[in-house]
């Protein structure tokens, strides 16, 4: 069963811990006039995530499905969600729309966003931030909710283990430990460093988010 935590007003973290992988998979539901589900989870977790979302909203009213980059835990069950919610559209970077999401997965054309574009869901405004290769993937893009100053930051600050849903402690060290650990196995180079990395991280820090949702 997924754990549900309200981490900011109307923003719910839905988390399933898979012990064999020592890893949490999290999705974020924004409860608003046009509900937004940021990340779908992989297909294997669709029943659990659907049950959690259904406890918060009528799943048929889901309007937006956020895809930060093209991996199973970000968008694996997108078709299932779009079948369940007939008015829902995927929202992703323009690169993601053009090179993968529309052709490989979405049942309907995705809303491709360019850097700085704003998506309004009702009370909340999500500014799209193009972040190619940060944390990974060419099509990567994050969302910053300007009303409550919440950064939906995808795999940035990734941590292993069944960690607490909300913390005010520094998690940079924990995230660095994961990167070092991953370098020893098949998940090496999980987040690489390139000329885009530092300016992108500096840009995100300059937003001064109150909440970082990862």
Language-model segments: what does each one mean?
Residues 38-40, 62-70, 90-94, 151-155, ...:
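Active-site neighborhood of phospho(di)ester-bond hydrolases with catalytic His/Asp-centered motifs
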Residues 2-54, 142-153:
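Conserved beta-strand hairpin/beta-sheet module of binuclear metal-dependent hydrolase folds
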Residues 70-75, 97-100, 117, 135-136, ...:
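Active-site environment of divalent metal-dependent phosphoester hydrolases
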Residues 33, 59-62, 87, 147, ...:
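A general structural motif
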Residues 45-91:
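Active-site metal-binding motif and surrounding structural segment of the metallo-beta-lactamase
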Residues 6-9, 89-214:
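Metallo-beta-lactamase
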Residues 13-19, 41-43, 67-69, 127-133, ...:
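Short, flexible loop segments at the rims of nucleotide/cofactor-binding pockets, characterized by
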């Amino acid at each position: 069963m997924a754990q549900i935590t309200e981490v900011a007003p109307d923003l719910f973290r839905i988390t399933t811990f898979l012990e064999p992988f020592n890893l949490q998979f999290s999705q974020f539901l924004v409860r608003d006039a046009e509900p937004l589900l940021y990340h779908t989870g992989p297909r294997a977790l669709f029943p659990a995530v659907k049950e959690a979302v259904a406890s918060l909203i009528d799943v048929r009213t889901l309007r937006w499905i956020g895809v930060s980059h093209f991996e199973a835990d970000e968008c694996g069950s997108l078709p299932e969600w779009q079948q369940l919610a007939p008015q829902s559209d995927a929202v992703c970077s323009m690169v993601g729309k053009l090179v993968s999401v529309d052709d490989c997965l979405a049942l309907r054309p995705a809303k491709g966003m360019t850097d700085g574009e704003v998506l309004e869901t009702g009370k909340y405004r999500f500014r799209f931030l193009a972040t190619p290769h940060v944390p990974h993937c060419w099509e990567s893009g994050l969302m910053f909710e300007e009303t409550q100053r919440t950064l939906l930051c995808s795999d940035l600050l990734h941590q292993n283990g069944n960690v607490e849903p909300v913390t005010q402690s520094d998690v940079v060290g924990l995230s660095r430990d994961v990167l070092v650990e991953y370098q020893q196995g098949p998940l090496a180079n999980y987040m690489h460093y390139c000329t885009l990395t530092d300016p992108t991280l500096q840009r995100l820090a300059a937003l001064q988010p109150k909440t970082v949702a990862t």
